[in-house]
């Protein structure tokens, strides 16, 4: 209704009635609506409906669409110059809805059935398809099939675009989609498709949010779940989320892709679903899409699928990334967002215009953009970022040229380098999920003193390092280890039993390109475990310590750090680091190793390493 009022205020002409907009402004769920070809598959099994039914339903659709498009023509016959004209439009809209009603009902039932999963019924859906194909009365049939009502209610909010806008997608009444929108604009939600138990149950008891650890939180939640009303609501919400995930998995195929044999990580963000939906809705070879999305579209591993979709199947015209320091959006000032435009094209993207770390939206309308605008060549993306093809965030064309030159002259990259040297890393422990690792140390002493204490005690407990306890080449920084875990508890989880006995390379996970240094790495002594703010080696006994020391020295170097800064947003990961180029350092490896050893061995915990090397 607000959209109508806004358009009426813009388009009002004195002496004419308000424009008829009922067939233009549609309310519905853009992410759960199927296309007509989806309706010819069984919602539960996913198998195609046999040819006989498919042929009947296609013939029925062709006939109905011909009628529907005639009603659309009636709707567009005039601008609505008087009350009689508007009445004619209302009548034409009613006839259009009646003509397409069977197929919209079919779409609602199909979506609902997919969302129900194993509780859905392919048989009930098949019976409904038969009814539609035979032009029987659907309302009567629905009353005979109670399961259909549940499916219809669940999927009733979906927006089946080609059945709502037949004049856009099915020219000349064709049952096949042969067109689409000329242009699509959007600023989609940026939320994750999940619900946080802490937030939900915190609405009923604020102590759930304030709980000091996961164990206490689980106890509080268990008490709340004893309330039938709360438990029922929680079950309903979880079922709704599960249903949405099922239909998204069915309708979208580029949310997660295989890269080097591994699926890209991350639960789908809502914006990624919209980005893929817009591609589906745009007209082949000439439809434009334009949107504002988080900068993760061009940088994150989880967005690799939709990023590749657009690079392969559209001409990605531009991608301009902004910092939110001026609070253009009511989000964290550190979060970045991107304005992107693409034109659907079978030729894909050969190059695109890009800019990063922009602040003022006025820059978009400047005549001269050469001070910040880059031209990123598609063939360079794989070389710079690997198969994920993330965009490097260079600030100038000179920076971009240097990044490309370093990549062209590399001997290997970080990912292959680690494999060659036998180094593997993983995140540390999330304390809120692992309360056994969150015991508080009573004494506040530095790492060197902590090593001595634990050695004297026989290492029956293991202290935790965090990002704030290390800096480059040192495990003693501004903060001291604050937590510990019993050795028995630590050895029963993950890699700690085999890894904690060795000297291990570790680096901070939280890092930004605006920090004094972005890559912060150190060698940890035996006996210490790590929380999630550090990535740490998992199998140090499989490689000589010299390999880790050389890697540490190179990781803390200025050239490597500069490359990291062109890629990082707010945190590091193996995904971001993997494609960073490594030059041939064979002639300098001894110097790097020797210098790193001297910078690292700063207390008794490194005595064995010093003597060994």
Task: List each language-model region with its residue ranges.
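Nucleic-acid modification enzymes, centered on SAM-dependent nucleic-acid methyltransferases
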Residues: 13, 17, 26-28, 66-161, ...
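S-adenosyl-L-methionine
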Residues: 2, 6, 16, 20-39, ...
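A substrate-engagement module of RecA-like helicase motors
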Residues: 44-56
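Non-transmembrane, amphipathic alpha-helical segments
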Residues: 53-60, 84-98, 102, 263, ...
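Short, intrinsically disordered, low-complexity segments enriched in Ser/Thr and Pro
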Residues: 55-62, 135-141, 497, 503
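Short, polar loop/linker segments at the starts of domains and inter-domain junctions
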Residues: 40-46, 123-129, 478-485
